[in-house]
């Protein structure tokens, strides 16, 4: 029987949760849940200049907002703890010392200046720089240097061999040993580099499948050589397609603000919509576009991941977000809308109009921010600024007379409901022998300032009885 599936997401906490990282985490999470496996969260926090507790928290916040929960990791300590690389330095040192003792790694005393000079020579010759093995056979440090100054390099096997692996997404990939050099495993300060630390951790944490972005394909070859040197069986690999920005360049923290998961939360995107959007950047299920978490859990498999880069399409994300705002229970949307209203100075919790507001505005809004902006500008304020062009057309002459008739009828209306208010429009329309649109537009302009709004009954309910009558009275003063 094969070992139980164990997958991991291992970000470097140097800032916010990147969209590419969120997709990697999501796919690993889905595969683990689908197969009854374990999803591990590990922090590769070895960049001491940039890794901060705030960045760790930003990643945790992003995953929590998306609803991607882990089985082991920060806050959920398991049998393979600790889950921060900086708390595992003794483990890396132990395995580095073992490789040195077995002649499979060595201390390198070359300075940055030495390597820069060698790199310049290679570039002038038109070739790529490869470490020439200057310290490969050294048994003692050169004069003036000691072991504390040395990095530790992996000793690539001599000869014309090759290394290959079969990727679950990309198929079989091969490189010759001559394409690889003696790469640095440990820095002089005892901190492991990526290729070394992740292999040690993946093995000791019993990770059975490593799924990560295609930018890590070339890292897989030195990692496989390390597995071989340590006598370990490597996990399976799946490399996921790149995500490109709208400019078709790799989605980057420096160039693309949309790379930050939490930007979308602040913009009023629903987590269901963002998950739906990112899963389809490299994976699809037939012609299905709106895909729920439950459907992802049923359908997703790494073997179905494509190889073509996904391109960020902001219009598609907004479309999906509108679909999700319309599909989710109105109570859920109301709860998520409240912080956006509060940010605009509107304390609306418990306001009986909120459910009607959401039902009405989500049909014509792309984000929670859109709904909140419309609510603040039209429904949760005193008075309204009229669009002069709309007012000139719809608040003069016969239109104003129709509005007066509406005002008179509203005064005596016992029930301020959508049905009753729509009935007023119909009543005035029939009594005046004009179409309902002729009656509705003056009301709409008086209430909202322009010619577009939800239905008249809904708009009157949202503005409220007292404020509606005040706005209509203000409009009638134009006559």
UniProtKB/Swiss-Prot annotation:
Its cofactor is Zn(2+). InterPro entries: aa-tRNA-synth_I_cd-bd, aa-tRNA-synth_I_codon-bd_sub2, aa-tRNA-synth_I_CS, aa_tRNA-synth_I_cd-bd_sf, Glu-tRNA-ligase_bac/mito, Glu-tRNA-synth_I_codon-bd_sub1, Glu/Gln-tRNA-synth, Glu/Gln-tRNA-synth_Ib_cat-dom. It comes from the Bacteria. It is found in: Cytoplasm. Zn(2+) binds at residues 108, 110, 135, 137. Its EC number is 6.1.1.17. GO terms for molecular function: ATP binding; glutamate-tRNA ligase activity; tRNA binding; zinc ion binding. A motif ('KMSKS' region) lies at residues 250-254. Its main location: cytoplasm. It catalyses: tRNA(Glu) + L-glutamate + ATP = L-glutamyl-tRNA(Glu) + AMP + diphosphate. It is an enzyme of class 6 (ligase). A motif ('HIGH' region) lies at residues 11-21. Binds 1 zinc ion per subunit. Keywords: Aminoacyl-tRNA synthetase, ATP-binding, Cytoplasm, Ligase, Metal-binding, Nucleotide-binding, Protein biosynthesis, Zinc. Belongs to the class-I aminoacyl-tRNA synthetase family. Glutamate--tRNA ligase type 1 subfamily. Catalyzes the attachment of glutamate to tRNA(Glu) in a two-step reaction: glutamate is first activated by ATP to form Glu-AMP and then transferred to the acceptor end of tRNA(Glu). This is Glutamate--tRNA ligase.
């Amino acid at each position: 029987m094969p070992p139980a599936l164990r997958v991991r997401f291992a970000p470097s906490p140097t800032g916010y949760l990147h969209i590419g990282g969120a997709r990697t985490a999501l796919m690993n999470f889905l595969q683990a849940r689908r197969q009854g496996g374990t999803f591990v969260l590990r922090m590769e926090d070895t960049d001491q200049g940039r890794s901060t507790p705030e960045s760790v928290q930003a990643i945790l916040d992003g995953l929590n907002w998306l609803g991607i929960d882990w089985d082991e990791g920060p806050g959920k300590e398991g049998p393979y703890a600790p889950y921060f690389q900086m708390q595992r330095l003794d483990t890396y040192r132990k395995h580095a010392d073992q490789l040195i003792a077995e002649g499979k790694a060595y201390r390198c005393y070359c300075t940055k200046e030495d390597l820069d000079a060698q790199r310049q020579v290679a570039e002038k010759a038109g070739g790529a720089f490869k470490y020439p093995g200057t310290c490969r056979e050294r048994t003692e440090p050169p004069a003036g240097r000691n072991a504390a100054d040395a990095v530790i390099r992996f000793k690539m096997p001599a000869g014309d061999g090759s290394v290959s692996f079969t990727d679950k997404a990309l198929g079989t990939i091969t490189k010759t040993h001559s394409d690889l050099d003696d790469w640095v495993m440990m820095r002089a300060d005892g901190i492991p580099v990526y290729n070394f630390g992740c292999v040690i951790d993946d093995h000791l944490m019993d990770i059975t499948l490593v799924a990560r972005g295609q930018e890590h394909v070339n890292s897989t070859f030195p990692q496989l050589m390390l597995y071989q040197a340590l006598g370990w069986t490597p996990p399976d690999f799946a490399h996921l397609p790149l995500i490109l920005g709208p400019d078709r360049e790799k989605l980057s923290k420096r160039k693309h603000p949309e790379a930050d998961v939490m930007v979308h939360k602040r913009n009023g995107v629903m987590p269901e919509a963002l998950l739906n959007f990112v899963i389809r950047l490299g994976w699809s299920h037939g012609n299905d576009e709106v895909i729920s978490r439950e459907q992802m859990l049923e359908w997703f498999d790494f073997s179905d991941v494509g190889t073509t880069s996904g391109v960020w399409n902001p219009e598609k994300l907004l479309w999906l977000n509108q679909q999700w705002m319309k599909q989710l229970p109105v109570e859920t949307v109301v709860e998520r809308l409240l912080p956006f209203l509060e940010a605009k100075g509107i304390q609306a919790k418990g306001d009986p109009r909120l459910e009607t507001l959401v039902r009405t505005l989500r049909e014509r809004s792309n984000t929670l921010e859109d709904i909140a902006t419309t609510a603040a500008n039209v429904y949760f304020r005193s008075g309204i600024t009229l669009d002069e062009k709309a007012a000139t057309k719809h608040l003069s002459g016969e239109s104003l007379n129709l509005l007066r008739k509406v005002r008179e009828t509203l005064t005596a209306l016992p029930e301020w409901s959508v049905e009753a208010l729509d009935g007023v429009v119909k009543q005035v329309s029939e009594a005046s022998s004009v179409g309902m649109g002729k009656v509705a537009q003056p009301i709409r302009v008086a209430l909202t300032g322009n010619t577009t709004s939800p239905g008249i009954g809904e708009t009157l309910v949202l503005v409220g009885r007292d404020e509606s009558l005040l706005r209509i009275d203000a409009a009638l003063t134009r006559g």
